[in-house]
């Protein structure tokens, strides 16, 4: 049957000093999943968060993840993924209080961060070369393949391992605006942009004399997109 083992340990810190709020978290996690395959699925990582708020008006938060994946060779398994966010709750400024019955919320926020993906479609351990155990057998004389209780199959290379594969990454940028009116209407606006790089793709043009049976994987894809989201 399937078995899953998950271990997590964390440390928390929270303190308020006058108008200052500080919150911190450090977390370690490790997981293994066995679905009856030859090799377990394993991941390991640490994460942290540090946030600061001043007088419920100014907010800053830093997050990070340092994650390891089984899908990459030693030296390429771990990736560092940080993010930073800041915010200003303008409606909490003293000079805005006389308008609070109209503008119950005015908030500006911005963030930048980096995330990673280790999933290679239909392939585990892409840094290892695979072997095909059902290749054409040896031929002797004029009798064809060796027969001993059936054909004796040969072994050939399948996918060639690529040792420098590493995490696919995406950098995210966001600017947001939140507006609340008369405690009845909420309006949100988000401008975002994403730059994805090191995308897992198979090389499409490989010379036949290279000897590759199948085109190898590589981190070379790039995609950039952005947009605007609004809600009312």
Segments the model singles out, each with a brief description of its role:
Residues 1-232:
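Extracellular/periplasmic, surface-exposed regions of secreted and cell-surface proteins
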